[in-house]
Amino acid sequence: MSKQNKQPLLQRPAVVGVLASLLSIVVGLVLGFVLLVLLNPGAAVGGMRAMLATGFSSMDKLGKVLYQAAPLMMCGLSVGFAFKTGLFNIGASGQYTMGAFFSLLCAIQFQLPWYVCLLAAAIGGAIWGIFPGLFKAYFNVNEVITSIMFNWIGMYLVNLLLANMPNMLASGWGASNSDRTAALNVANPGAILPRGPFAALFGNSSWINISIIITIIFAILVWVILQKTTFGYELKACGLSRDAAQYAGINSKRNIVLSMVISGALSGIGGGIYYLAGTGQYVLEKSILGMGFNGIPVALLASSNPIGTIFSALFISYIQVGGAAMQPAYSSETIDIVIAVIIYLAAFALLMRGVIAKAVSGRKEKGGAAK
């Protein structure tokens, strides 16, 4: 019998990780409920019930959960991949924005099909990820600082480019709006992600498309790269100890840059699949898109595990869809605060790991003393 099999169940890393995530979710929900009670005691139970039940109340709502989970999952994979390689990619929002721009550029300006647009989204995100990687690898500049800067640079650059490309804007396709890109169903229906098998299952009213399948495939692919390949081992080795990796003959500078490029590409795909759904238009922004930042709690809740990211993204999407059903008992601002509390407290999985480990070790010591 292997050593892994002899190890007590509650001491196995995989089991502890799952328990930590579940405990974090419970704590987040409890504190969210307390906040609802403080704000409107009479509606707290009904509000929490609506939040937890709405996602399964109809096929349309379930489809919306899956639709919103797809870009969240890609951003979570992006942040989690960087975490696994010892980097903190807080620039996922900028990479997401560049991915959205590249995909829409191919869709509207060049009239290309959806799969080419999605590839362009990955390239856009990768390009925006390479700069923080280069600064980190060759000048040892903290990637948090550079990636935050590139979030803002990316947003304003996209605004500038779109403002000077009339054919990209809705006003260039007969609409009155000049502050957003053209609707894909007007400009290029062939660039909209197909609905595949979901059309018959969820009906025409649902927004769901094959993006959820694409993101699950990417999650599995990232897991295989990190866990089953030499390349993934080298990336993680650089993250654990750059000096030790160099001593072992691993090119740490190259791997740091590649880590940020891959992480950026994943965020870029997230931006691509969101806007290629055909349900929204990119609006010239005055603040950074929040989707990239939402990838951080997705990754933390999953302990940066690519497979766990699938479930954490689904949970966060489910809470967001359910939160909309809490009106009119609660204002939209209140709902946003409650959802934020639940999501960010649910991301304390690492802290909960320590709590579980301490509880298990304490029980083990008591058992040993009793003997």
Q: Which ranges hold each PLM region?
A:
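Short loop segments and helix-boundary regions at transmembrane helix junctions
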Residues: 7-19, 83-91, 110, 122-188, ...
